[in-house]
Amino acid sequence: MSDNSRKPVTGIFFALGGGVTLSVNDLAIKALSGSYALHQVILIRAFVGMAIVLGVIWFSKTGFRQLRTRRPLDHLFRVSIVMVSNVTYFVGLSLMPLADAVATAFVAPLLVTLMSAVILREQVGPRRWAAVAVGMVGVVIMTRPGAGVIQPAAILVLISAFCYASSHMMTRRMRLTESAMTLNFFVQCGFILVSLSFGLFAGDGHLAQAPGSTWEFLFRPWHVPPVGDWWAFLATGVAVGVGGLMMSQAYRTTEAALVAPFEYVGMPMAIFWGVVVFGSWPDATAWAGIALICGAGLYTLWRETLRRKKDLDVAAPSGDL
């Protein structure tokens, strides 16, 4: 088997492994959301993730030289939207069944398509626009607007998906000058600085919200975790560090349109964790939303693959492919 033929298999392997690993992060955050403050969880997660990033940098060929950047303001903006994406997603996750939150977040690939057309002026055909529309119908279903009441948690996850898609736009803008390690390093730095500052300000619990309120997870006081809970703190840090690196490797070695559909392994994993750990099985409404959002996302990625293959066939001289 040639190196070229191995690359897609390797990229798919990393994408599947990364998707499964990152699903552990959602599981761990969900498990911790009933007892701890979000900024405490994020701080510990960031320290663990930073240790992994620094370890990889230490053993890499270019070492810490790769952390030099000429785009500090772009990093600041990207880190800011990544943090908003994380906070809104995890607050929403604390209030929703795991599978519902993950399904709603999977609207992000559709938002990337929308932003690519509006911001990057990329051509989007009518079929992909139709897929975006179908996915948005799924989003409306997931917000459960019965009796005129929109579920606030779902709105938070939608805000997260928008910010997540925006971070992809920033990554594309920065990809020619910034390495994956540089992007990851500054994100972890941002998490550490902001969560530590927020903890010093609100960690005593003076902003604590009433039990069951939307922002309870964000404003709880800090407390020292018992030994029995450390598995979840370590799991979320390791999952983000290792899963993020696996996803980066997948997209580095294999065409994005081929890799992206395999990220949807996170959906069955979310259903699995929800049933096994939390005893939460998606209801009929959730299944309808999951089918529409994931189906539309996968169709969009499939159309993108066909479009790119057609472009390559047209561009390549006869006999080159």
Region spans (language model):
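Transmembrane alpha-helical segments that form core, pore/gating elements
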Residues: 30, 53, 149-210, 219, ...
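Transmembrane alpha-helices of multi-pass small-molecule transport proteins
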Residues: 35-84, 163-167, 187-203
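Hydrophobic transmembrane alpha-helices of multi-pass small-molecule transport proteins
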Residues: 127-144, 160, 285-304
